[in-house]
């Protein structure tokens, strides 16, 4: 086999291997990626299709806590959605602050959250370190 053909064969083999590796990585990531939508974008998505993340602000005086769940309104200052969450809220969760919720849309006005993330700015310092 000539040197030129051998080099072409090795290059083709490396290209095929890298193509397969990229394909498998992207396929795996597709199943695990959870996109970040605004409230307005999330409302128009098909209900309950997949796990999504929605970001916005907690509406003032909208937080209702009872024994089994927390209910609050979240807005992007364009539209709002009611969020239902069962679990412990993060310590930085408060009204009029940023929040990202992960879960599924139940209907166009209710979001069932599995996880709640409180957003903060780059100057955040935990109380322990202050």
UniProtKB/Swiss-Prot annotation:
Binding site for heme: 120, 124
GO terms, molecular function: heme binding; metal ion binding
Extracellular-side positions: 29-130
Residues making up the signal peptide according to the UniProt record: none
Entry's Gene Ontology cellular component terms: plasma membrane
Cytoplasmic-side positions: 1-7
The keyword Membrane appears for this protein: yes
Membrane-protein topology: Single-pass type II membrane protein
Biological role: Heme chaperone required for the biogenesis of c-type cytochromes. Transiently binds heme delivered by CcmC and transfers the heme to apo-cytochromes in a process facilitated by CcmF and CcmH.
Name of protein: Cytochrome c-type biogenesis protein CcmE
Species for this entry: Wolbachia pipientis wMel
């Amino acid at each position: 086999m000539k040197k030129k053909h051998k080099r072409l064969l090795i290059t083709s083999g490396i290209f095929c291997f890298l193509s397969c590796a990229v394909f498998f990585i992207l396929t795996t990531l597709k199943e695990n990626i959870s996109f970040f939508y605004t409230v307005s974008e999330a409302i128009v998505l098909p209900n309950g299709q997949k796990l999504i993340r929605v970001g916005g602000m907690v509406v003032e005086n909208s937080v209702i806590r009872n024994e089994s769940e927390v209910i609050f309104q979240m807005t992007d200052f364009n539209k709002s959605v009611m969020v239902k969450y069962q679990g412990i809220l993060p310590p930085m969760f408060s009204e009029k602050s940023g929040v990202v919720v992960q879960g599924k849309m139940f209907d166009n006005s209710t979001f069932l959250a599995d996880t709640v993330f409180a957003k903060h700015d780059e100057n955040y310092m935990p109380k322990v370190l202050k």
